[in-house]
Swiss-Prot record:
Transmembrane segments: none
Post-translational modification: Myristoylated at the C-terminus. Glycosylated; highly branched oligosaccharides. The pattern of glycosylation sites are unusual.
UniProt family annotation: Belongs to the NCLDV major capsid protein family.
Protein's UniProt name: Major capsid protein
Keyword Glycoprotein recorded: yes
Taxonomic lineage: Viruses, Varidnaviria, Bamfordvirae, Nucleocytoviricota, Megaviricetes
Amino acid sequence: MAGGLSQLVAYGAQDVYLTGNPQITFFKTVYRRYTNFAIESIQQTINGSVGFGNKVSTQISRNGDLITDIVVEFVLTKGGNGGTTYYPAEELLQDVELEIGGQRIDKHYNDWFRTYDALFRMNDDRYNYRRMTDWVNNELVGAQKRFYVPLIFFFNQTPGLALPLIALQYHEVKLYFTLASQVQGVNYNGSSAIAGAAQPTMSVWVDYIFLDTQERTRFAQLPHEYLIEQLQFTGSETATPSATTQASQNIRLNFNHPTKYLAWNFNNPTNYGQYTALANIPGACSGAGTAAATVTTPDYGNTGTYNEQLAVLDSAKIQLNGQDRFATRKGSYFNKVQPYQSIGGVTPAGVYLYSFALKPAGRQPSGTCNFSRIDNATLSLTYKTCSIDATSPAAVLGNTETVTANTATLLTALNIYAKNYNVLRIMSGMGGLAYAN
């Protein structure tokens, strides 16, 4: 008897739980037929003058039935003496707001793009995103490069939430962009403006889905309800790390709606993307002889291999209506363990997550905390003492968890984000949110 057959006949009572009354086979491929469709990317008309510090907008044209991905293109010129650059296309896109029928649906910020990338993109996706939005660090002054910034609104992330323009006959969909007045290494060198810096050019491309007649009619005539995600951000708080003591701070969380996670970072408001004392560097802290000019260079690879000891947060906890939601945990727990348990990625130092959901990156809801039903929510923070000479990285890494480099006192902007669920209702040619703040 063949050896495989001996395994096959070795069948007992326990096997019933695995193979009794089988529901699938691995040896017959099953597929499903899909509705006929086509996708085309079409450039939009920009209203306003594109330039540093300006605001522009675009009204999504009615070229197709649904819209999904949106990519913003910038052409930037490396300016003057160069200066340190770090994701300049992100930095330039200071914020972008989505509006339907005059109602704000969502708003994203350049720091949120950086935080989202740090938390949710993995390996090749993160590297490819960097290629789209950052210099590769060897361009000469005067070099031009075309950058691509994909938007991350709810309908940009899955075709199942594609926005049905065909059902919004009476409401327009608009995007409002605010462009930053200063971009490191483009028109600003870290301390002053770069003379003669070239203005950016900008274009907006939208992916349209064209449906076949029967499905197009259904989308146009039937009402729709979409479970969407929104970003809540109430503005930067002022962080208060100290060079002489372990300072503490309580931050009121003014959020609403069922929320699946909180994400926060401490950043240097004059150096985009710097979330640690030494500006997020991967291998520059390997020895005591590293020059200061090297250790303050941002991590272009964004590999997340740098040490949490360079971050300013010592510990944190959340309180709901005066009750501890959980015991005080170290900052490294929110940077390492929480992302590991809920997302599975490697998060750069200085970016923190607390998830109420089992799988916060998934479209399927898997847990929330309803902040609309909480009167008083507080994020309690304790900072490290920022007292060690930043020019000696080995001294920083060789010390205790409660101290860090003196340059961590520059991390004075605290950005806290909440990602919540809401319902977008579309009927009678109009769309709007089911629940307001």
